Amino acid sequence: MAQAPDREKALELAMAQIEKSYGKGSVMRLGDEVRQPISIIPTGSIALDVALGIGGLPRGRVIEIYGPESSGKTTVALHAVANAQAAGGVAAFIDAEHALDPEYAKKLGVDTDSLLVSQPDTGEQALEIADMLIRSGALDIVVIDSVAALVPRAELEGEMGDSHVGLQARLMSQALRKMTGALNNSGTTAIFINQLRDKIGVMFGSPETTTGGKALKFYASVRMDVRRIETLKDGTNAVGNRTRVKIVKNKVSPPFKQAEFDILYGRGISREGSLIDMGVDQGFIRKSGAWFTYEGEQLGQGKENARNFLLENGEVANEIEKKIKEKLGIGAVVTDDGVLPAPVDF
């Protein structure tokens, strides 16, 4: 075995050769540079930001959002798009389902005029477009809606009854192999929305599985299971859904946390409702019977009235959000000037 000084010299020569061939920073000691904090994109719900552990969705990573139909998957993704744009970012939406509603997206705060939208014909085209946009280095977030709608070209060109075993899984596997490095280098967040299917003949455990094979499960840094748990009513009229999100996988913080928030029809995630829930949990808002009180000031009787008070008094909502985030040590702060990202060390 070579002596320690010789080994160190050999290693330095090898590292110099690698940097000469592949560029500076292609190999380094982890302690050589200060670790950058994980940059995030807020989700629009403070409860979900807290459950994610770092204050939002991590930049430069693959995110999977899945759940039953009409559970709020696309709404969560569009709120992330709106927050990325509010911080000055560029967003793209690959609409493989051909179901994006621009008017609804606008109500959630998405700048539809600057949003890049593609409605591809095939799965290959969708993923190639996403890959090219990511490699441009100019994108902050891209949403692929949905994995189930990424139909391989061979399946489209074939007959209706033809069997195409594993084509979509191979397509996803190849695309994610190509994308992962580019996402990290460009700091782009890729959100894949996915659907649920039932496995046949499962006797024990959950029969539910997601489409597109196993590659996305491995490459995703965060996987979120979105479920509608209750219908919100104003008298007899349904006005929204109570939604529960479980973080089933998290590479940047401890997983298996849950968040609950309200999604209101035509308005999306209720930021004010989420602030009331978290404010009560953290002791900033006092709940006495049906009345909600903040620092001696009555917000209203019943959650709906308290929500409307915060909606009309944005400075109070911002103050409550700031206190919650400071206490829990997470994420970005929303001010009158928009979303101010606050990267979090982990």
From Swiss-Prot:
Q: Which GO terms describe its biological process?
A: DNA recombination; DNA repair; SOS response
- What are the binding positions for ATP in this chain? 67-74
| Keywords attached to this entry | ATP-binding, Cytoplasm, DNA damage, DNA recombination, DNA repair, DNA-binding, Nucleotide-binding, SOS response
Classify the source by domain of life. Answer: Bacteria
A GO cellular component entry from the record: cytosol
Q: Give this protein's Gene Ontology molecular function annotations.
A: ATP binding; ATP hydrolysis activity; ATP-dependent DNA damage sensor activity; damaged DNA binding; single-stranded DNA binding
Query: Pfam family of this protein, just one?
Result: RecA
**Entry's localization field:** Cytoplasm
- Enumerate the PROSITE patterns for this protein: RECA_1, RECA_2, RECA_3
Is ATP-binding set as a keyword in this record? yes
Q: Which SMART domains does the UniProt entry name for this protein? A: AAA
CDD domains annotated for this entry?
Answer: RecA
Would the keyword Nucleus be found if you checked this record's keyword annotation? Answer: no
Q: Which family, according to UniProt?
A: Belongs to the RecA family.
- What role does this protein play? Can catalyze the hydrolysis of ATP in the presence of single-stranded DNA, the ATP-dependent uptake of single-stranded DNA by duplex DNA, and the ATP-dependent hybridization of homologous single-stranded DNAs. It interacts with LexA causing its activation and leading to its autocatalytic cleavage.
What name does the UniProt record give this protein? Answer: Protein RecA
Which species is the source of this protein?
A: Mycobacterium marinum (strain ATCC BAA-535 / M)
Lineage of source species:
Bacteria, Bacillati, Actinomycetota, Actinomycetes, Mycobacteriales
Which gene is transcribed and translated to give this protein?
Answer: recA
